[in-house]
Amino acid sequence: MAEGTDVRRETLRNFVANNLEITNAFYTHPKILVTALNGPAVGLSAALIAFSDFIYAAPHAFLLTPFTSLGLVAEGGASKAFVQRLGISKANEALIMSKRITAQEMLQVGFVNKIIQTGKNEQETFLAEVLKEVEDRLGNHLNNDSLVRVKALIRKPEREMMDGQTVAEVLGGLERFVSGIPQEEFRKIANGEKKHKL
């Protein structure tokens, strides 16, 4: 019994540490982060995208944060970053309702900078178009040091608040795991008792 408890405790400790570390790495990253979103972004990955400085999406891309459907709470700083980037209405749809947010919806609210018109099987074309856009917009005509200094100034007011929000999310997730709620939701999905929107 004690050995199983130790394994569970270690698993939870790793969950907390890894979640805090990866989220912190994204919202404190000093360089310009560009995301080329050429398909679905789900869960923690979707949350972390919100910390990108520029996001380019394919028309078929979408965000899905099924935290509430799985008995979890928001993670990856999404409870703050989504509100900032999507606006409160779309953030509520994404986080509370576990609603899929399409590329067009993301463009309308300013979550993405541009939709690159390519098909689902045109990954190479999509990447080439994103790289061309980045080179055109962030190329040699701009001073690299100024870019990162301006980013630091833009992000400075939210850093301390994000530290607290990320800890609150991780502790909320830990409480849910300890109570067994997500495990029960995953069991229902595995047994066909519950359909999921993925």
Report each predicted region and the residues it spans.
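Glycine- (often His-adjacent) and acidic-residue-rich active-site loop
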Residues: 1-22, 41, 71
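A structural preference for short, pocket-lining loop segments at secondary-structure junctions
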Residues: 1-7, 24-35, 54, 58-62, ...
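Glycine-rich phosphate-binding loop at the start of an alpha helix
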Residues: 13-20, 43, 76, 100, ...
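A general structural signal for well-ordered alpha-helical segments in protein cores
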Residues: 19, 79, 88-91, 127, ...
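CoA-thioester-processing core
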Residues: 21-26, 36, 42-95, 129-130
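Well-ordered beta-strand positions
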Residues: 53-54, 93, 97-99, 105, ...
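C-terminal long alpha-helix characteristic of the crotonase
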Residues: 56-61, 112-168, 180, 192-197
